[in-house]
């Protein structure tokens, strides 16, 4: 495990280019810090299919989490808004879709509903938001900032450990610095290693 994976902060920003094996490993390590069979895993994905996420999980972690929920945003499934299905890859994985990637209100509602469904079980809840770079293609920085301010607060209140992916090469310094201020920890992948800053 990397040092990043040992973070227990409520909200973590991962600054790394896409297609980095170190980023994928750290993402999975953050999602599987404890016994996976006692975890609720929420995966919000704009660009990756739930099946590819499940395959990565099985190859890296092995054991299925107690609850696995995907919110697949945009064209990753090409399904109707709000559809919930169970994937054949993992019997306990539920996939919900949101067809409009710019619908932050709808996304916030779906995330809140998942957290509410899990609030009474004793499992640890972890989340991955993949990625803010994709979200910023559909909404401006200030709108995303407001959305994340509410979302990170909601995660903190619910005791969720969440990490958010952002490609630093796709955004200017002002955008990155604006978003950094929302997170308890920022991990940046540079020269083959993670540099971590916490507040």
Regions found by a protein language model. Give the residues of each.
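Glycine-rich P-loop/Walker A and Walker A-like loops and their local beta1-loop-alpha1 context
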Residues: 1-58
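Structural motif
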Residues: 14, 126-129, 163
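Short acidic, S/G/P-rich loop/turn micro-motifs used as interaction or catalytic elements
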Residues: 19-23, 49-51, 77-78, 133-139, ...
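Short, structured coil segments at secondary-structure junctions
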Residues: 37, 64, 181-183
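Short internal beta-strands
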Residues: 42-47, 70-73, 163-166
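Phosphate-binding/switch loop-helix module in NTP-utilizing enzymes
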Residues: 77-146, 150
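Substrate-engagement module of ASCE P-loop NTPases
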Residues: 146-170
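Phosphate-binding/switch region of NTP-binding enzymes
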Residues: 165-199
């Amino acid at each position: 495990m990397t040092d990043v994976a040992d973070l227990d902060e409520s909200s973590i920003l991962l600054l790394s280019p896409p297609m980095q094996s170190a980023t994928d490993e750290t993402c999975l390590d953050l999602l599987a810090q404890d016994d996976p069979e006692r975890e609720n895993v929420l995966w919000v994905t704009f660009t990756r299919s739930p099946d590819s996420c499940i395959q990565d999980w099985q190859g890296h972690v092995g054991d299925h989490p107690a609850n696995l929920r995907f919110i697949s945003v945009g064209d990753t499934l090409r399904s109707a808004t709000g559809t919930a299905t169970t994937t054949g890859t993992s019997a306990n994985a539920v996939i919900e879709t949101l067809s409009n990637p710019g619908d932050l209100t709808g996304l916030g509602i779906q995330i809140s509903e998942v957290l509410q469904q899990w609030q009474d079980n004793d499992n640890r809840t972890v989340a991955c938001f993949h990625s803010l770079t994709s979200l910023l293609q559909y909404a401006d920085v200030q709108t995303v900032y407001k959305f994340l301010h509410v979302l990170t607060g909601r995660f903190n209140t619910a005791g969720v450990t969440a990490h958010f992916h952002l490609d630093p090469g796709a955004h200017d310094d002002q955008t990155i610095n604006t978003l950094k201020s929302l997170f308890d920890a920022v991990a940046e992948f540079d020269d083959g290693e993670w540099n971590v800053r916490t507040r």
